[in-house]
Amino acid sequence: MSKGIHFEQSITELEEIVRQLEKGELSLEESLKQFEKGISLARRCQNALNQAEQKIETLTGTDSNIELDSDEQTSD
């Protein structure tokens, strides 16, 4: 569960960095610092998502193609 918390914290922090950069009020040096931090956070989040996807694929025994039971497939 702590990985989920870290993911959520990273997303929140990344959103804040984007807001700061979009305002355009930071100095060039501070903007570069925040951009670098944002890239690091984005990579960390992407890695967490990739790991979650792999775990789901392992648990379902598929590669993102989950088959529905015959009862779930009927739309009538």
UniProtKB/Swiss-Prot annotation:
Pfam families: Exonuc_VII_S. Heterooligomer composed of large and small subunits. It is an enzyme of class 3 (hydrolase). Belongs to the XseB family. It is found in: Cytoplasm. Bidirectionally degrades single-stranded DNA into large acid-insoluble oligonucleotides, which are then degraded further into small acid-soluble oligonucleotides. It catalyses: Exonucleolytic cleavage in either 5'- to 3'- or 3'- to 5'-direction to yield nucleoside 5'-phosphates. HAMAP family: Exonuc_7_S. GO terms for cellular component: cytosol; exodeoxyribonuclease VII complex. It comes from Legionella pneumophila subsp. pneumophila (strain Philadelphia 1 / ATCC 33152 / DSM 7513). Its main location: cytoplasm. PANTHER family: EXODEOXYRIBONUCLEASE 7 SMALL SUBUNIT. This is Exodeoxyribonuclease 7 small subunit. Its EC number is 3.1.11.6. Keywords: Cytoplasm, Exonuclease, Hydrolase, Nuclease. GO terms for molecular function: exodeoxyribonuclease VII activity. One of its GO terms (biological process) is DNA catabolic process.
